[in-house]
Every structure is written in C-alpha cells, then in structure tokens.
Amino acid sequence: MNIPQVVSPQEWRAARQNLLAREKEVTHAKDAVDAARRELPVTEVTKDYTFTGPGGQVSLAGLFGGRRQLITYHFMWRHEQSGFPDEDQGCPTCSFLADSIGDLSHLHACDTTLVLVSRAPIASIERFQKRMGWAVPWYSSAGSDFNYDFHASFDEGKAPLEYNYKDKETLQRETPYIRSGTDGPGVSVFLREGDQVFHTYSAYARGLDSLLGTYRWLDLTPLGRQRHVTGFPYRDTYDQEP
C-alpha cells in the first residue's frame, strides 16, 4: 500500500501548520456562508399539504411538533414508479445519510424538528424504518404535491422539471437520470410564526455533503472517503459484499 511521504517530526509540524492555515480559511468562509444562509429571504407556504404518519394524517404545520423550525429530508424511495419494479424500500444512499442522524434531543432543545419525508405508502416506510432501527420521525407524502413543489420528485404534469436549481434543458444535458417519475435527494427548511409557515432554504445533491457523518470522519484520514456516496450499501448488507 502506498503511504504519504515520510518526514521528520519537525517537517510534519511545519506541513500541518500550513494546512491549518488553509483549514482556518475554509472555516471562516463557511462561517460567512452560514451567516448569509440565515439572512436569506423567505417565502410563505400557503398551499395545504397532508402527510401520513404513525398517528394518521398531519399538515405541514403539524410536522413542526410545536417547535419553530422544521427540517425535512426528502428521502428517495425505490419502487416500480421510480424505476425499481422489484423493490419497495428506501434508497441506500439516503440510508447512508440517515445512519448519521443521532439522538434528536439537541435539535429539539434548539426549537427545531427534523423529519424524513418519502413518496411511499406509510406501511412501506414503517416496515423499512423498523428494519433500519431509526427513531427519527418519518412521514409519507404520497398523494401530496409536497415533493414535487419542493423539487425532490419529478412529474411534469405536477410541476416543471427542476432539480438543484437547474431547469429541464440543463438537467437533460448534465444529469439525464433526473426525469419524470424519479426522485432526488434534498433537504428543505421551514420556519413557523404563529399559524404562518415560511420556506427558508432547500439544498440538493452535493449541498447535502455536510450531512454525511461518515464522510466527516473519513475526511480526516489519509485514505479519505474511498467510496462514492452511491457506493455504500444498506448497513445490514455488508456481509453480502463480494
């Protein structure tokens, strides 16, 4: 196995200090971007969306659970309509991300609710959630325009084809796998003020990188990420890898 250059402790320290300066530049740049994100304008959500959870139907406002902020992760689902005729389960890449979600107490203490949303029947969601052992609340948006309006599911009969702020022409040229009938991963954030709900932010594709906890740890190592994000299987199937 090839390893990085072997040097003296003094040389290593000098190289590490050089990298530290670059890391601090990135940290300061990220601080500025995070501040700009908090200052984004918002749009009011006036459309009624209905979701189905373990306790029955709930509105978008109901997903907040009485808190002021709501983060929804658009969890892709594998089924016949999305091009997987022999499957009825969550996307393995979205599962890789969900495996990084820990206890939600700290989010709740900051007046923030995190939920997963999928365009799948609630019975299928509950079966898969039990298999994976996740405690994060998970809702079905089946029959709702929610996924389409926030550009995480694609049906030109419901909404113009758009993903990651790219129009249909750009998508057909750059990412032809984004097409009607499919889903895309994403996260959408909402703020509640009394009875009003506002959409504040949505991110897709590489914009979700910071949510991948496994990558955060691997990025600290000399071998790095090693696998593309789509190369991670369901965590309970590693013993089936060749």
Predicted regions: what they are:
Residues 118, 140-142:
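Residues at the C-termini of beta-strands that transition into short coil/loop
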